[in-house]
Structures are given as structure tokens and as C-alpha cells.
Amino acid sequence: MFSDAPILIAEDNLYVAPDLSNAVEDMDGRVVGPASTVVEALSLLATRAVAAAIVDCQLADRDAAPLARRLAERGVPFIIHTATAVPRLIGDLHPDVPVLIKPLQSSAVLTCLLDEMRKCAVFK
């Protein structure tokens, strides 16, 4: 379904990150990451092509606001997948970004990501 699209996974949970990675690969996507910190995710975004992203709003080093900002600046569709409340800064700057609350099956997360990619014309 992802047709070899590179999908950035920014997730610091040791169980969720590999589960999402496997699910992306099972749906013919290429995993970029997973990144457990904002610094790592921004580095990957600077050096790798990314078609879309799944972002936990609280990573190991800080909240993901800088990553969300950079993704939006580049026009990369993304979704928030979190177990905590979305930080106000992310919610205020990106009110239209879907927020999925953990726990949630990976298939539901990826269905939502595909919908966002279609809205942004990454897939038609």
C-alpha cells in the first residue's frame, strides 16, 4: 500500500517503535528510523527523503514541536501517535494534524497515515 514510500517513525517506546516499523514494512513501505529523539529525527529528515511521518509528541529528549514544525515546513504529511496529551504548541500550530491515542493497533495508525498522504497528494 505504501509503494516503497519512505516513512519516518519518531517513537521512543521500545515496544511501539518496532511494531510500527514492522507494520510499515508489511505494507510495502520503507522505514526511516525509528528515531527515539527529536535530534535524531531532525537529522534523518535532513539527510533522507521522507514521504510521511508518524510522530510521538513526547520523545526521549523533548517534545516533538521542532520536528512537527520542520515536517510542516517541508509539506510532509504526518500524524501524532501519543499516550500523553498533545503539547499546546503542537496543537496550536498544527490543529488539523490527526492525533491518535495509544494504545492503538498499528493497522489503524497506518490507515490514518495513508489517509493523510492521500489528502496531501502523496498518493492519489
Model-derived segments and their meaning:
Residues I79-H81:
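Hydrophobic/aromatic residues positioned on beta-strands within the core alpha/beta folds
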Residues L14-G33:
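Two-component/phosphorelay signaling modules centered on CheY-like receiver
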Residues P34-A52:
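Acidic, metal-coordinating helix/loop segments flanking the phosphotransfer/catalytic sites
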Residues E11:
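Conserved acidic carboxylate
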Residues A46-R48, R69-V76:
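Conserved phosphotransfer cores of two-component systems
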Residues M1-P6, V39, I90-G91, I101, ...:
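Non-catalytic signal-transmission and effector/linker regions of two-component phosphorelay proteins
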Residues V55-A72:
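Conserved phosphotransfer microenvironments
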Residues V97-V99:
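Conserved phosphoryl-transfer motifs of two-component systems
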